[in-house]
Design a protein with these regions (language model features):
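Glycine-rich Rossmann-fold phosphate-binding loop(s) that bind the pyrophosphate
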Residues: 154-155
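Residues that mark the start of a beta-strand
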Residues: 5, 147-148, 171
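Phosphate-binding beta-alpha-beta segment of Rossmann-like dinucleotide-binding domains, i.e.
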Residues: 91, 99-148, 160-163, 182
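An N-terminal-biased, well-structured beta-alpha scaffold segment characteristic
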Residues: 1-96, 200
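Residue-level detector of anion-binding/catalytic polar loops
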Residues: 29, 94, 116, 171, ...
Length: 224
């Protein structure tokens, strides 16, 4: 009989065999679901000691009340987007994130999107596939060197964005009330400005901020 139970509320990985092996190696049981409602999650986790969560949410009072043995809930990600931390605290459940989750993957993808938009890569691909050719229909195709790129949120991913973007010869700005102007980026120049100035000066803006009450609707029509 297992000494404890760990549940995965939902997942996007191909499989969770590595996680199962790790849990079972220390005497636990791993139960896996793709929960779409609080009722489904409670059915899966009513006797669980720990929970891993990806996208299903919110994990709040109803779930915690229905899982009285639960001691910890872990978000597969940097932000607590799907976890009601205050509710977890009320029920004596520790809420944990993964602060180094996919830093390179997210920054690589964001830069890929910037390249695709600026250089019209997706539009050009669609043209070629339909038998069209030529640069004229794609104009303007932007020169990226010399652009001003604004980074909203200079956490781990934002900092990695700054380091990678510096190789393109762009001017970098950032807006983040929690990071000082003297932040060390290993020699990369990235000037701190207020959000209004960042929006006014930037050719492109990349947002790497937690989803919470402070950042909800942070960028809106008034910014542009």
């Amino acid at each position: 009989m297992a000494e404890f139970k760990v549940v995965v509320s939902d997942y996007i990985l191909p499989d969770l065999e590595i996680e199962r092996e790790m849990v079972e190696a220390i005497g636990g049981e791993l139960a896996i679901g793709q929960c779409q409602s609080a009722a489904e999650l409670i059915e899966l986790a009513h006797d669980a000691d720990a929970m891993f969560n990806t996208y299903f949410g919110p994990v709040g009072d109803e779930v915690y009340a229905g899982c009285p043995k639960l001691k910890v809930v872990v978000r597969f990600g940097i932000g607590y987007d799907t976890i009601d931390v205050e509710a977890a605290t009320r029920h004596g459940v520790m809420a944990v994130n993964v602060p180094d989750y996919c830093i390179d993957e997210v920054s690589d993808h964001a830069i890929g999107l910037w390249l695709a938009l600026g250089r019209k890569i997706v539009a050009a691909d669609r043209m070629v596939r339909t038998g069209e050719w030529g640069m004229k229909p794609l104009q303007p195709v932007l020169k990226l060197q010399g652009q001003t790129v604004g980074i909203v949120g200079l956490g781990r991913i934002g900092k990695q964005m700054a380091r990678k973007l510096s190789a393109f010869g762009v001017e970098l700005l950032f807006a983040d009330p929690h990071v000082g102007a003297d932040v060390d980026l290993g020699g990369v120049a990235c000037r701190k400005v207020e959000l209004e100035e960042l929006c006014r000066l930037s050719d492109a803006i990349t947002v790497h901020a937690l989803a919470n009450d402070e950042t909800h609707h942070l960028l809106n029509a008034e910014c542009f």
